[in-house]
Each structure stands twice: as structure tokens, then as C-alpha cells.
Amino acid sequence: MSAVSGWWDDFFWGSLVVVELFFVALIMTILFGLIGAGAKLSNNRVAKSIASGYTIVFRGTPEILVLLLFYFGSAITLTTIAQIFDPEIKFVDFPPFWAGSFAIALIIGSYATETFRGAFLGVDPGQIEAARALGISSLKTFIYVRIPAMWRLALPPFGNHMLSLVKDTALVAIIGLEETLFVAEQAIGYTGKPFTMYIVVGAIYLGFSTIITFTVMGLERYANRHLEVTR
């Protein structure tokens, strides 16, 4: 492991980038998933069609292709807009961090849409009827009754989505974001030790995955605590 000794700082900062990317993409994933699930469960045909198209496209397209299309497509769009105001501008780069965050969130959000939709359908209708009988508005019922009940059902599969999300952060290395895999590629160029560097990256991601797994297990126990008490 002597080949890695001069790269620990770089791997540390690369790991922090992975953490930042994970949490930003996670927030957007939840938003995309909730919006998509709400649209698929609505009575609006247009909203249903858009949500269905979203899940079909992003679940059926290779993840690396989505990332590249989003990154370069955004850069081309920004460049076109900028050239309207200043024809001398040749190219406007889109920040790799935000391109990666949006692309990963769109991909995982398409899976989360179906997870949340199924969880919403699994909520006991009696809880909704009880809220209505108490005169609670539809919005408050959705926020305080349906979402908490839905989360209990959605947590196990959503934990898998979180694992997929953290692993997908490795893809952003191809658009120049300096995360752990990018650092490994740089280190390999200097040391000529690809196996060693990839083992380090694998260990880092395994550590992240382990933390996520135990976190989700803890959240599941918390969400089901009232069920354990009644047994």
C-alpha cells in the first residue's frame, strides 16, 4: 500500500465530494420521486402521461448516457443563450457537480417514483377516511397522514435506491468531477498501480454502502416502533 501513501489526502477530499454529491442528489431524488408518484396517482391524464414517460425513459436509458447527455446538453444550451448576448463567447461549461447531481437524481428518481407510488397505494384507506371524518384538509392529510404512513412502506426498497445512488456517484468522474474514482485515475497515471488504487476506491464505497445500510435499518426500526410495541 506504499503506492497510496502520498494520495490519502486526495482520496479524503474526493470522498467528501462523494458525500456532498450523495446528499444533494438524495434530496432531489426524493423530490422527483414524490412529484412523479403524485402525478401517476393523480386523475390528470397529462400529468400521468408525463410521469409515465419520465419513468420509462430514465429507467430504460443507460445511466452513463444520461449523465453525458445532461452534462453536454446543458453546456450547449448555456453556450447558445450566452452567445445571444455576447457572440464572442465560445463555450460555457456547466458545473460537473450540478450536472452529476441532476443526472443521478433523475435516474434514481425514476425508480423512486414507482417505489413511492406503490407505497402510497399500500397506505391503509381507513387512516385517510379517519382524517377526513375529523375534518382535516386534504393537504394536511397528505402531509401528516399519507406521507408518514407511506415512508414506513417505502423505506426498505428506497434503501436500495440509496445504495444505487451512492455507487452512481462514481460515474461523475467521466465529466471531470474530482471524486474518489477521478483521484484514483490520477494516481494510477503517476504510480502505475491500477489494482491498488481501485481497491482503495472499492473500500471507500463499501464503507459508504455499509453506513447507508445500517442507517436504513435504524430508520426502519424507528418507523415500525409502534408495531413492535403492540405485539
Range-by-range predicted roles:
Residues 1-231:
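Transmembrane alpha-helices and adjacent helix-loop boundaries
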